[in-house]
Amino acid sequence: MYRIIAADLDGTLLSPENKITKYTEKIIKFLIEKGFYFVFASGRHYIDIMKIRDTLNIKVFMITSNGAQVYDLNNVLIFENHLDEEIALKLCKMKYLDADIITQVYRNNQWYINNNKIDNNFCPTLSSLRYKYFCPDVFNFKKVSKVFFTSHNLKKLHTLQKDIISFLGNRVNVHFSVPGCLEVVSGEVSKGYGLKLISNILGISLKECITFGDGMNDQDMLSISGKACIMENADSSLKKNLPYAEVIGSNKNDGVAVFLNKNFIKNNKFIKCF
């Protein structure tokens, strides 16, 4: 039986409106009451994930910034690993002046965006943080958890991904969370590493973990768990890379909650009442 439930947020647990629906909320709370451990695993900043958790008034583990930080049930930081300062600087200079690509940084509790851009349609609606402008020549690159690039020009982002891998190799992990967002963290961290850490702390085997995701940054987490579930709306490359994973409903239709209800709490009177 699975005891740890780990889920990505955007495109997975969250609705297309970037909310936890009432139905999903009730399923999560019911399972936590029954002794299951929940893990929110996301590329989002810690502050964003914390606010989602606090809105639900629950205790969950949190894997933030694609594994750069991991928090326990009591909101204690139990792991962090930042990008090397030199690497973060190089990343931020790669496309800083490209008019089609927005360079963005998570450092400590702040979100930064390159100062030659005004239109940033990708992130303000997804985040409770408000960005500040930065210039890499005078920026302090200590404790940068993630550098990410957003663009409507997907061809440029795919070329950038190849360039980063060629230039930095395994010193970084670089993945698309969604087609228009390329994310880079330290090569020593990932959602999968965060899940391993949590399973070790709890003394629960990874075989007793079930995972849910939709993006390429979810692949390593999905690949190490006892059961992997991919959203109907997931990246086609993810489905191709993990052919054994079960494809479930879309986030538009509460896919995760519907699956959990059917497979974990079927015929329970509490669930039947809503």
Curated annotation (Swiss-Prot):
PROSITE patterns: COF_1. The keyword Magnesium applies. The keyword Manganese does not apply. Its cofactor is Mg(2+). Mg(2+) binds at residues 8, 10, 214. NCBIfam families: Cof-subfamily, HAD-SF-IIB. PANTHER family: PTHR47267, PYRIDOXAL PHOSPHATE PHOSPHATASE YIGL (PTHR47267:SF4). Belongs to the HAD-like hydrolase superfamily. Cof family. This is Putative phosphatase BUsg_029. It comes from Buchnera aphidicola subsp. Schizaphis graminum (strain Sg). The lineage of its organism: Bacteria, Pseudomonadati, Pseudomonadota, Gammaproteobacteria, Enterobacterales.
